[in-house]
């Protein structure tokens, strides 16, 4: 079954609740959402919110707002990280930030 946003790529620089909730709907509608997480902070702070499935960091809260997404860590404070972000953005339909 084809979904309305099949073929749309969105780079999501987001964390916690509102941003991930919004892009979750876009992913559910078929968009390829690539979530960018900060490695220096351990990724999205939503990972720390309980309850946890099996161990700390495996948060039910995080999983529920980030289903159907791809995820990668990227240091946006480094020149290399910013270059990778620019390359991803050039190959995407939208960049989302909250």
Task: Identify the function of each model-found stretch.
Residues 1-98:
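N-terminal helix-loop segment corresponding to the beta1-alpha1 unit
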